[in-house]
Design a protein with these regions (language model features):
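Short, charge-rich amphipathic alpha-helices with coiled-coil/heptad character
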Residues: 1-13
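Heptad-repeat coiled-coil/leucine-zipper interface motif in alpha-helices
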Residues: 24-27, 62, 73
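Short E/K-rich amphipathic alpha-helical oligomerization segments
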Residues: 29-57
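Short, charge/polar-rich alpha-helical segments
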Residues: 12-26
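Acidic, serine/threonine/proline-rich low-complexity intrinsically disordered regions
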Residues: 56-67
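Long amphipathic alpha-helical coiled-coil segments
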Residues: 44-47, 72-88
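Extended heptad-repeat coiled-coil alpha-helical scaffolds of eukaryotic proteins
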Residues: 29-33, 67-71, 75
């Protein structure tokens, strides 16, 4: 092991965060698809139950907002990384 610590540039750090957010977005999308299938089962399918359909609808809306917010954060970070790279 080395005693020297590697310090990342801000652009490198932001690039790492962007990669992590993209991975999180992938899993969030998968979760949204799972919630959607459960919602359909409660809303129109074989387990028709209005109360659960409403609960899953609320969860889907929140998950959709999370996906939108993650997408926006990714875009903002990518713009910042590009600007930092152009400055150097």
């Amino acid at each position: 092991m080395s005693d020297t610590e590697v310090v990342k540039t801000k652009a490198d750090y932001l690039r790492d965060v962007t990669t992590q957010l993209k991975e999180m977005r992938h899993y969030a999308q998968t979760n949204t698809e799972t919630l959607s299938s459960h919602w359909l089962a409660f809303d129109e399918g074989e387990y028709k139950d209005g109360e659960y359909a409403a609960k899953f609808d609320t969860l889907l809306n929140k998950q959709g907002k999370l996906l939108d917010d993650i997408d926006q954060a990714i875009q903002d970070l990518e713009i910042t990384v590009n600007n930092l790279e152009q400055e150097n």
